[in-house]
Amino acid sequence: MSRMATSEYIGAKRRAYAQADRAKRTRILDDVCETTGYERKYANRLLTGSRKFRERKGRGRTYGYDVAEVLKKVWREAGCPCLPYFKAEVGRWTEEYATQVAHIRPEIKAKLLAMSDRTMSRLLSGEARVKPGWAKGNKRSGRGGRNEVKASTPCASGESVSAHRAPPGDVQVDTFALGGGDPSDNFFWILDVTDRKTQWTVLCPTWNRGQHATLEALEHIEGKFPFDILAIHSDNGGEVLNHHVAAYLGSKAKAPFLWRSRPRHSNDNAHVEEKNRSSGRQLFGEARIDCPSLHGELVRLCDDWSDFRNLFCPCRMLVSKEKRPDGKGCRCRYDKPRTPYQRLLDEHVLTPEQEVSLRAYRAKLSGMDIYRRVLKRLRKIRRIQAAYAKAKHEGKDLSPFAARPSLALRATPSGTDGLHREGTQHAANNQHMSHAEERRMSVQYLANQKTPSYLQSVFSI
């Protein structure tokens, strides 16, 4: 049948189809399908006069444009964290935003609290993460030569004992460079100390990784930890494994256990290596900072950033890791996101006075306020560093950028003609100590240190 004949035939059957009962409609529909060869549902639509599909109306949008805009603003003010971590603390972030930045309507706040991290990811798709770090490209050169302290320090993987079995106070130590990819001349390094059990991390700048500057940074970091340090696990670098630092550790009433990574096993210090990136490089990027006068600003910046990361930023820890049945990769399981502050309180290792003091310190701080202060300090450091680099390139006087005598910068700052080369005396007790005395105390400390009970299965000293 031609198309015109088919159309006339359908038109003739349509009126009879409309007036027929159910049984007659079935027979008419059978005849039309047999005559035209049409599929049964299509023929039924032609006979009833319904030629178009009626699309089903879907469910309306739960989170509209207004909710998405508020989510973007709160997320940016919180420092653009990963969304599972943002979801874990979204209640506190929305409260801080509502009290410090702008009012949030109750219905929008309720939707933000009910939203899943996957929905947040969908609403924030295409949004660029604004991170404080800057610049790219950095390489670290190695060191050679025999180190007596290194040879006397027990050696094992920092992951020999699971982080879940280690008590708070088992820390890992590492440094990373702010040299901008150029290892020549002098510049700042960052000393990074991370507790394995709670993930409590503190950063502090040090000039050129010298033993005196490193010890000052280590003492400053000890004061930022709310609990005692029981053990220090370092890589094989000489900034920590030296007689000066070892003598200081041995002079303490509760001397921590010092041990190190295995040679050529870069993942033995895995927890602090990960924090070098998530806490350190996220802040500084790969920039070069070599202006000596920036030491004080860098200390204050690192203190603020450490408080922000420890008190307000959740993190996850690996619970189990097993190979897949097909042998392709591993299946990793993590615990629920919690801040290092929450993890520390859950361990119940603090005295009542320490816990009250820590809770009071946390209560008077605001995460968004700290983050804005970090960005402000970072802009100031960039401005001073740019002025210093320009003056150095043009051969101008660099004395305005020289370090103050109170800073123990043992190496000569770039272009300062030996200003403040002498540094300060022993940072531990401000008393002069000969190298021979330091070496004697260091050797005695390393020979007599006792292995903690949770590491007995790793060492037999």
Regions found by a protein language model. Give the residues of each.
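Secondary-structure boundary/capping micro-motif
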Residues: 1-231, 236-461
